[in-house]
Amino acid sequence: MQKSHTKRLAVGALFCALVMAATLLAFPAPVVGNANLGDGVLLLGAWTLGGPFGAVAVALGAMLADLIGGYAAYAPGTLLIKLAMALTAILLDRLLRSFKLPRGFCHLVAGLTAEIVMILGYFLYEAFVLSYGPTVAAANIPFNALQGVLAILVSVSVYPLVERIGLCKRL
């Protein structure tokens, strides 16, 4: 069956918009920034779309949320951090599945690793690029970790539904 580039582009745009919306529905972090369910949608989109296209689509959604939500200073970092997260989730999932491991386990490990990338990425970005310093950046680590745990729970539990409707096979 030939893959439809139009359908893939449409689903990529949909996930971009969904990541943006889920990210904008946020609650403020105790020191700087915010936490949201955008990462859960980001992981879903990354695994559904796959490859560099999927990573770019979901990372753009997160960056657009920063621009719209008043966190423009975070936008460049978010683009790079979320791109690294998505690529980590996609590539590690693909690697683990090559060993014929259960998909849920692969997503759990890949999602956890991607969220560690997010936590480390935002710590470095806040501490050194935004010049908040390591102490202020470290204060957000528990909040980012909570966001990561929620993202893993959402993405790992919802992905079987995405798979069941056949969206992954049709792209």
Whereabouts are the PLM-identified features?
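Loop-helix junctions at membrane interfaces
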Residues: 1-171
